[in-house]
Every structure is written in structure tokens, then in C-alpha cells.
A protein has these predicted regions:
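Intrinsically disordered, low-complexity Ser/Thr/Pro/Gly-rich regulatory segments
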Residues: 24-95, 100-296
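Short, Lys/Arg-enriched N-terminal segments with co-localized hydrophobic residues
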Residues: 11-26
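Short hydrophobic alpha-helical segments enriched in small aliphatic residues
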Residues: 3, 7-12
Length: 296
């Protein structure tokens, strides 16, 4: 039984915002909250799908919805954009629909002719966005590979006033985001994910009205290579880890919570990565035969 005093409910909290008394419950059903946010996102994606007829415009609107979702809920240390990823040798990836990169340790971003270019060292994750997952797993994998093959650098940095050694390169998360799946069940997607090899392997994805998934891999520690010895060995170490991947399990969520199981899995992977390695700016400046002083 609710207990009230002067019209106020003892089971609720109250606060003033803009001189208005607002009421909210002391307890909230998290499942209802997740369902509400999921339905809101799905409704927006379905509006794009049903009412935007031009394929290019429909795709751009869908990409922007995913970007805005991740910008809203990821911590401020991460930035999210559509971009092309570059390395210090001038190589570039394919244009990625969603790139999650470091907001602090990204010393420069190029914008030219409507395209954004982000250094590979700053990238945490990349995703391909499609309306339907059908026929697009391999395509997404090839685009993810175009980022992972880039030549990343890593140098020492100052941490809490002390010089820290160059951090070993971290994995780059790769995945696919879609509004729907026209496959009957999840087995076809699982088979396609199992067929991916090496740098093309995907880590997770969200098929919004079907379920999210993550891929659990068995990986083999490379022999005879120390990931901390030098940057060349470090690159080879990461490559061999990817090449050793064997799918242990592809796990799908319930469709009712696909969006937030995907999001929380992504956050967990980002937490595991920590912070991206410090970029070697002088490696990029070699292109213009210049160099900066690294100390002060």
C-alpha cells in the first residue's frame, strides 16, 4: 500500500528541474528500460527502411543512427565517426561506416573532400552497417581486414610523470550492424562466421530485430616472438594471433535485448583493450621529410 503525505508518494523520489516538481520511482525494471530503448532504436531504423527510397540515402541515415547511438552511450573517452583509416606509409583502409577511436590520443584527423581520415593507431573498433545481414558477412570481414592490415606504430609515453615503454599493439575489434536478418534462424550466420579466417574474423555484431552475437575464439600464442621486443615483432605477433583463431562458439542473444547485449559486450571488449598505444608522430612526418622534438 502506498503511503502518501501532502500528495507525495513514499514509493517515489522527487526533484526540482526548472522550478517543476518531477516524480520518479525508487525502483525501476531494467528489462523494461532496455526494451524501451531497444524499441526506440528499432523504430528509427525501420522508419529509414520503409520511407527512404533512395538506397544511398537510406544507408547514410542508418549509419548515422548507429553513430549517434554509440556517441550517446559510450564514455567520452571514445569518439565515433564514419571514416577512412590511414597509416604512416600512406596506405588506407576502405571507408568504414562506424569507427570508434580514442578522443585523447588522436593527435590529428584529416578532413579532405568530404572524407575523414583517422590514424590506425587511434582505432579501437570498426563496423560495417547494412539493412540486412544476408549476403554481407564476408563483405564486412573484408572491410575489417583492410583496417587490420595497416601498419601501426607504438612508442614510449609519459604516464603519471614517468616514462613508460612502448605498449604492445592491441587488437582492433571488428563487426557488423544491421537492422534485420532475412535468414531463417541464426545457423547461416554462424556458418559464415566460422568460415572467416585471420584478419577477416569478426568479433561481434547486432542484427537488431533478430539478436546480437559475439564470437569466442581459441587463439594460439605465437612461438619465438616477443610482443614487446620491437614494433616489427609486435606487428607479426598480432598477425599470428589472428591467423591462429579457431571459432569455439558463436553466441546469440534474445532478440528482445539485442541492442544492449551488443552494447555491453562492446564495452567489455573496449575495457579489455584499455588504451590504444601512443602514436609515433615522426613516422607520419617522414612523408614530408620533417621531424619534431619528442622531449621538452
Amino acid at each position: 500500500v502506498s503511503v502518501s503525505s501532502n500528495g507525495l508518494n513514499a514509493h517515489n523520489f522527487y526533484c526540482y528541474i526548472n522550478n517543476q516538481l518531477l516524480e520518479y520511482k525508487k525502483m525501476i525494471d531494467l528489462r523494461d528500460l532496455f526494451h524501451g530503448l531497444q524499441n526506440q532504436m528499432l523504430a528509427s531504423l525501420n522508419v529509414n527502411r520503409e520511407f527512404i527510397e533512395h538506397p544511398g540515402s537510406k544507408g547514410e541515415a542508418t549509419e548515422q543512427h548507429w553513430i549517434e547511438f554509440l556517441r550517446t552511450y559510450l564514455p567520452d573517452r571514445y569518439k565515433v565517426d564514419k571514416a577512412i583509416v590511414i597509416d604512416s606509409t600512406g596506405n588506407v583502409s576502405e571507408q568504414m561506416d562506424v569507427v570508434i577511436y580514442d578522443a585523447i590520443y588522436t593527435p590529428f584527423i584529416f578532413r579532405q573532400n568530404g572524407f575523414m581520415y583517422i590514424p590506425a593507431e587511434s582505432v579501437y573498433a570498426v563496423f560495417e552497417v547494412k539493412q540486412d545481414v544476408k549476403g554481407h558477412i564476408e563483405y564486412a570481414a573484408q572491410k575489417v581486414e583492410s583496417v587490420r592490415t595497416l601498419k601501426r606504430t607504438s612508442i614510449g609515453m609519459i604516464d603519471s610523470g614517468k616514462t613508460a615503454a612502448a605498449r604492445p599493439l592491441t587488437k582492433i575489434i571488428g563487426g557488423i550492424l544491421t537492422t534485420t536478418s532475412s535468414y531463417s534462424g541464426n545457423n547461416t550466420v554462424k556458418v559464415q562466421l566460422n568460415n572467416l579466417k585471420g584478419l577477416q574474423t569478426l568479433d561481434l555484431g547486432c542484427l537488431c530485430d533478430t539478436g546480437s552475437f559475439y564470437v569466442d575464439y581459441n587463439e594460439t600464442e605465437p612461438e619465438g616472438i616477443a610482443p614487446t621486443s620491437n614494433i616489427e615483432d609486435n606487428r607479426e605477433y598480432i598477425r599470428q594471433v589472428y591467423e591462429s583463431r579457431k571459432v569455439k562458439e558463436v553466441k546469440f542473444s534474445d532478440k528482445e535485448v539485442s541492442l544492449f547485449t551488443f552494447f555491453l559486450q562492446l564495452v567489455n571488449y573496449l575495457k579489455y583493450i584499455g588504451t590504444v598505444p601512443a602514436i609515433d608522430i615522426n613516422a607520419y612526418l617522414k612523408a614530408i621529410h620533417a621531424k619534431i622534438d619528442e622531449d621538452i
